[in-house]
């Protein structure tokens, strides 16, 4: 049958941007589907149905690039945590990129890029990239990634594959499957990349504290002055404090 022929298709490269958090996707008709190798997706959310559908159609050396809502990185509801755990333990997750907000015209849902591979170069490791600070607002509501932003992400991934990448605090980290397991198989990049190191401005600590304390003292004085003026004005109209 046509369906049987379609189920036999195996692709080397798959790119997908399926609808986010789709409910009512026909789960009841696909309860024992062969594609659910890592667990049956919940009826109320198709994210892991899409993901497993793509994995099923992947050739032995195939790769997937997929956009999913951020909930998929950490959700435990409806068995999603177990499915994610099984996919991670199958060593399929090559890279996760947390994207900045406002990249879409039609939704504000924050998203991530999932890169999966059947035959990863870096076995037992996953690259996490936190790209939430990248991009430029081109209108009040829409952000775009510049060519430099895209190159930074691509270069980081290529260095990971080559085994030459060094972790960059606040941006990227290479993490073993064992360490992901210690984080309950949650794939949120922010958990792994840490906080960006702040550049030392060279001002000695004692001087900085002295300056900031002095500025705070001035602000307190101004605040007290304003408080007095407000009380006087309220008093003048018969509402004295």
Task: Place the predicted regions along the sequence by residue.
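Short, small-residue-biased leader/transition segments that mark boundaries at the very start
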Residues: 2-9
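A conserved structural/catalytic subdomain of Rossmann-like adenosyl-cofactor enzymes
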Residues: 10-239
